[in-house]
Amino acid sequence: MKRSLMKDGKMLRECIEQYKYYSSGNNQMVVYTCLRDSRVFVPWRAGRVNDMAFIKEKGKRYLPVFSNEAQQGDKAGSFELAEKDFVDVITAARFANADGILVDPFTVPFLVEPGEYDTISRMITRTTSED
């Protein structure tokens, strides 16, 4: 798969929507594969290293990421968006002791729990950098 197809987050959103509609283990692995090769947007405060936004719900802290900038909507507050490889976000979530990574939390949310981080990180990339 060409990395350019992953660029706008559309493929990631479609994989998540398919999983939500046809919730199965196979579709979950498709989402994980797509996440493995995705660049996502992470809210953070400019000028402050490792100062990321968290969504707090029922005593848990989730690191939100967005498939593209539009998915954040008007909820930016004092945060800017940094574009990162999803596997780098996993490292940040571990470092911050997040209870999970919440993809597109304001539209069609998909939760990646800490127990799945290694599964995603160890997947072989399916993208090529050249068109």
Mark where each language-model region is.
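An interfacial alpha-helical scaffold signature
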Residues: 1-131
